[in-house]
Amino acid sequence: MDNMNHEELNDQLLVRREKLHNLREQGIDPFGKRFERTNATNELLSLYGEFSKEELEEKEISVSIAGRIMTKRGKGKAGFAHIQDLHGQVQIYVRKDAVGDEEYELFKTADLGDLVGIEGKVFKTNVGELSVKATGFTLLTKSLRPLPDKYHGLKDVEQRYRQRYLDLITSMESRETFVTRSKIIREMRRYLDDNGYLEVETPMMHAIAGGASARPFITHHNALDMELYMRIAIELHLKRLIVGGLEKVYEIGRVFRNEGVSTRHNPEFTMIELYEAYADYKDIMKLTENMVAHIAKQVLGTTTIQYGDYEINLEPEWTRLHMVDAIKEHSGADFWNPMSVEEARELAKEHNVEIKDTMEVGHIINEFFEQKVEDKLIQPTFIYGHPVEISPLAKKNDEDPRFTDRFELFIVAREHANAFTELNDPIDQKERFEAQLKEREQGNDEAHMMDDDYIEALEYGMPPTGGLGIGIDRLVMLLTNAPSIRDVLLFPAMRHKQD
């Protein structure tokens, strides 16, 4: 911002402070009291929008509304303004002879951004705009800072994220996104509750970071003098509840991963995890597609949505594709025949797939998938049959134990869900954890830690179980056509602001 803009802003701040002082001198509270509304702006339009000008004059409908002044015009003894609430805007018409000298003076000196209450009669202007003719004008909150230019809004994307309150004031689209987010979560809860799932709450601070391959945030508990990890997944506590006999459970909550920030990643994000006893990953596939389709229908009214340049069909049944078949289809590489790690490395070299020296065959298969397949999965696709090496908590496939009964859901080339038939063999689980410990020793700081308490829980017996995790932020991105995760988080993680 140049010096001129600084000076203009400072002048505006001074003028508004002076108005604040004058209000107090007159005995008017610039940060007022409770105001009772009869209607929101959208209710006025739905209730009275169809009436003619003459019908409204005859009915003399009295209303009480409140909101923020977004536009204002007029001279002399009358003026117009638009006030905005959560749901939209409505025009008000203020005449000196209708509200009195004192209240008209309040209207005249009001600034854009001030919050006001209006009592009045509903009418239509000569051009047919539904409006409220004020009989009372109340200042509810004096705004001491000018709003961004109404014609341009917040063009600085970073400012939109840092000052979300300004973004919400100036962008109806942004407000609608966050209202939709709330509806998505509400419908998700409703669907699961109606299908017999029990919502639970489990700790966010763990003695051992587990349930996912990710770097944790570490904190220190002073009273207990111990290090704790902010949870990287909800999984292991929910599976303990399955052991305890809570047969269908879910939790919607925050998860924390000490990793990079991008259009798809935020260090803290919201997940739903659910677990169902006596089910497997195929049951969870059906649950996933039916639940997402239900949410889209209830919130958006359709299962056909637009995301960027793509039209996405969320109507079940979705494509199911084994990871090895997907790799063969898109790269020609065939991993169905067992091979040594040397052969897998040679295959990676032939197909220009980047790998690390420490990778086993399963890791190389996964790299093939991520580098050759993932960005081609636009329509909803369940990729199943992940290698054991990258799935330490999933049950091995009975027919080919190199792979697991696990799936990931991809839509618009992004992972949206991860699920498996849960590993309930405590001996196998301990061996998997030990293999993960070796990976940690080789430098993989995302490998799983040993969790003896969880193994002990499994030793009491966990029934065959299907489990699912869905990143709610990415689902909201999909259903609101948002290009970045920051567009669906009210207050995303940001770097320190540079002076």
UniProtKB/Swiss-Prot annotation:
Its main location: cytoplasm. PROSITE patterns: AA_TRNA_LIGASE_II. It is found in: Cytoplasm. Its cofactor is Mg(2+). It is an enzyme of class 6 (ligase). Keywords: Aminoacyl-tRNA synthetase, ATP-binding, Cytoplasm, Ligase, Magnesium, Metal-binding, Nucleotide-binding, Protein biosynthesis. Mg(2+) 2 binds at residue 415. Mg(2+) 1 binds at residues 408, 415. Pfam families: tRNA-synt_2, tRNA_anti-codon. Its EC number is 6.1.1.6. GO terms for cellular component: cytosol. Binds 3 Mg(2+) ions per subunit. It comes from the Bacteria. One of its GO terms (molecular function) is transferase activity. One of its GO terms (biological process) is lysyl-tRNA aminoacylation. It catalyses: tRNA(Lys) + L-lysine + ATP = L-lysyl-tRNA(Lys) + AMP + diphosphate. Belongs to the class-II aminoacyl-tRNA synthetase family. Homodimer. HAMAP family: Lys_tRNA_synth_class2. This is Lysine--tRNA ligase. It comes from Bacillus cereus (strain AH187). The lineage of its organism: Bacteria, Bacillati, Bacillota, Bacilli, Bacillales.
